[in-house]
């Protein structure tokens, strides 16, 4: 999963009259909380490493990501990064496509937008735009999805990653269960979150 270093920066999206806050970097880059209430900081910049399959991640998480993949593969699990860093434009395209799909099913524009936002993060609120979150899929020629997701759930914290959107925390995160979405927070924090069975929002509250 070797790669090359690239650079990128984030441009604040036009948010109209939406009430929002810019996510705080007070607790460090690895603990930036991005969700529907907290948008990516306007001046956020990221140095990217390109993986062998063309996906990109923040260079700071690359060593632990590689370590995690090496460990999984050594135990016979086949997995790969399906999604890494996304630009603002790419996130907007995903949203537009999801809205269009619902409209094609006969939903009104407002209905389609509301439904789409249950599945796709509003541009400016996606952790993929930080570069420190990855969607991990199974190489089904080697492992089942369930086996890979189970391994990740039980072991990702050892490498600094957390399952960002657990099924029992939807009311807090505002996002449905995503067993493939892992976010880097650092090994110490990831172990705390894992052992306590909490989500990132709850952990950040303990720091306030």
Language-model features, listed with the residues they occupy:
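Extracytoplasmic cell-surface/polysaccharide-interacting catalytic and binding patches
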Residues: 1-208
């Amino acid at each position: 999963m070797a790669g090359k270093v690239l650079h990128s920066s984030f441009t604040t999206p036009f948010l109209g009259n939406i009430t929002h806050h810019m996510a705080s970097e007070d607790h460090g880059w690895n603990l930036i909380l991005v969700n529907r209430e907290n948008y990516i900081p306007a001046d956020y910049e990221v140095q990217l490493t390109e993986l062998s399959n063309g996906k990109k991640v923040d260079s700071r998480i690359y060593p632990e990501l590689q370590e995690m993949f090496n460990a999984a593969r050594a135990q016979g699990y086949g997995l790969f990064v399906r999604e890494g860093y996304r630009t603002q434009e790419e996130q907007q395209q995903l949203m537009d496509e999801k809205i269009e799909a619902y409209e094609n099913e006969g939903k009104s524009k407002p209905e389609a937008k509301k439904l789409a936002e249950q599945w796709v993060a509003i541009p400016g609120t996606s952790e993929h735009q930080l570069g420190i979150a990855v969607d991990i899929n199974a190489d089904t020629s080697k492992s089942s999805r369930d086996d890979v997701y189970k391994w990740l759930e039980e072991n990702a914290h050892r490498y600094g990653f957390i399952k960002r959107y657990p099924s029992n925390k939807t009311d807090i995160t505002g996002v449905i269960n995503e067993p493939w979405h892992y976010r880097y927070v650092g090994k110490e924090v990831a172990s705390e979150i894992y052992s306590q069975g909490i989500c990132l929002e709850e952990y950040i509250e303990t720091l306030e």
